[in-house]
């Protein structure tokens, strides 16, 4: 392969095993806590959004689940871990705060989009008077949020831009 044909590494991506310039011991500590050492992010945060999706998926068959969905509250990454039983919650928050700002911004943009969608759907469901309307809102929101959860998971796991592009087009 010629020099012009070789792919260049993205300078905005943190090198494997390095979260904010951490060392091998820090990377091992992060891995043991289920935090990706390359990105400094943990998939546990996605459980917060998966819970909302699960409730939305139940609404068409069980309209009474709308009340459960309406009880879902947005939480930031730090708020989620602070409120969770995640063993390494302080480490998760610290790693997030030390993450590459470009990766964290990508991740935060996606989680912000999910939060906006779920909040808007929640507001619309509060106004809806018919179960059929709530079911339609739930189905639409699920279709919008699920790909974003997948995309966020790709960022957490250090997926490449090509992976992200593939997810967004399929």
Predicted segments, located by residue:
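N-terminal acidic, proline/glycine-rich, low-complexity intrinsically disordered segments
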Residues: 1-16
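Signal-transmission coiled-coils
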Residues: 20-165
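Acidic/polar low-complexity scaffolding segments in large eukaryotic proteins
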Residues: 166-170
């Amino acid at each position: 392969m010629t020099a012009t044909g070789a792919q260049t590494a993205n300078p905005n991506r943190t090198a494997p095993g390095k979260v904010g310039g951490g060392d091998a011991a820090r990377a091992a500590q992060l891995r043991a806590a289920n935090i990706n050492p390359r990105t400094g992010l943990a998939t546990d945060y996605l459980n917060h959004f998966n819970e909302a999706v699960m409730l939305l998926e139940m609404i068409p068959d069980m309209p009474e689940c709308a009340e459960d969905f309406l009880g879902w509250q947005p939480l930031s990454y730090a708020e989620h871990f602070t409120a969770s039983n995640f063993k390494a919650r302080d480490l998760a928050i610290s790693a997030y705060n030390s993450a590459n700002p470009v990766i964290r911004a990508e991740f935060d943009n996606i989680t912000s989009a999910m939060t906006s969608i779920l909040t808007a759907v929640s507001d619309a469901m509060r106004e809806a008077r018919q179960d059929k309307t709530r079911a339609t809102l739930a189905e639409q929101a699920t279709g919008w949020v699920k790909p974003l959860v997948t995309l966020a998971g790709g960022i957490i796991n250090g997926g490449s831009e090509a992976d992200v592009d593939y997810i967004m087009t399929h």
